[in-house]
Amino acid sequence: MLEAFFWIAVLMVLYTYAGYALVLRLMPKAPRPEITGQFSPPVSIIIAAYKGAGVIKQKLDNTLASDYPRAKLEVIVVTDGSDDGTDTIVERYGDPCVSLIRQVPRAGKTAAQKKGVAAAKYEILIFTDLTTVLESKSIPELVKNLEDPSIGLVSSEDIWVKLDGTTTESAQCAYVKYEMWLRNRESEISSIVSASGCFYAVRKMFFEPIPDYLIDDTVIPLTVAEHGFRCLHHADARSYVPMIPSADREFTRRARMTLGGINALMYKKGLLNPLKYGFYSVQLWSHKMFRWLVPFGLLAALITNARLVSHDPLSFWGIAMLAQLGLYAAAVVGFVRRNQPSTHKLIRLSYFFVSSNLALLLSWYQFVTSGKQTTWSESRGQA
């Protein structure tokens, strides 16, 4: 019985990180109507900002440098109780297509976005984070996919960079590349199950009023799928996302984002029924729910392995236990050296893997004990 539990736990972890990717790799692409690339309706760009005085002007400059027709752009900045001068910078920006909405008192990102949507004039909404940098072609590349009436949402290709804008080979970046590959294959086969909150476009009809503790980039794609429309990943709509410079802050961010994802999936839990939603439900289980359950699989594998090795330490179970202990020992070394760029790649990957799953455990604890978080901290890359 213990052996069965061990192998179930191990296979669940392996399926989550490798098996699902293999399934996507083997599946055929779904047919898609041809698009002309000439689709350029007016769009409303919504930027939720909290304490963004150091970056808001650069964000507006970058957004308005787009190749998209300026006359078809509306930029709405919603400040969430910022007291650092962000409001004043937006007011003085001096472009007629830029407007400011103040949210006082502070109520969180989702509440700010809802205020922005309520003020938006156009039927195509674009959400982008304050510190995300776009290429000049990113907005037109994103929007052109909505020429296909079966598409409800289009998400970007995220590229994580250092604060100076240069690329890096960190464990976090490797994970993001893996995530972008999964989304690209999901998009070719069916539909992505979550969007890049840094930069995505959605039809206004799918932006439903949601509780402030939910996060938009998970619940909105679920809403689109619920209505029978597709969500795409578009690799040519690139967004450059500055890495969080602190490993501790990255841990907190991952826990917060996972808590939001769990809440969103529980809010739309009917989509987990494969009898009603078919392969999309399989995607949700494989890409989201199983991944969030991995820490429990790791714990089960460790506990059952410890029991099994106590009966026969020189067998396969002894080797398996050494492998597991080696992973966690490497993670401890990675934790001690988490701010040292010279740390070996395998050590960094071990630390990232273990710390990510500890963040998932924290998310489940928060979900069970409180379940809700509405506010967010300063922008990525800010002190």
Where on the chain are the PLM-derived regions?
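Membrane-embedded multi-pass helical conduit in multi-pass membrane proteins
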Residues: 37, 241, 291-372
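Short, acidic, metal-binding catalytic loop of nucleotide-sugar glycosyltransferases
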Residues: 61-72
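A conserved acidic beta->alpha catalytic loop
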Residues: 79-88, 105, 132
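Catalytic donor/gating beta->alpha subdomain of glycosyltransferases that bind UDP-sugars
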Residues: 95, 146-179, 212, 216-287, ...
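Glycine-rich, basic loop-to-helix element that forms the pyrophosphate-binding segment
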Residues: 103-120, 140, 177, 219
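Long helical/loop segments within the catalytic core of UDP-sugar-dependent glycosyltransferases
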Residues: 110-112, 136-214, 352
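Short aromatic/hydrophobic "clamp" motif used to bind/position activated sugar donors
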Residues: 125
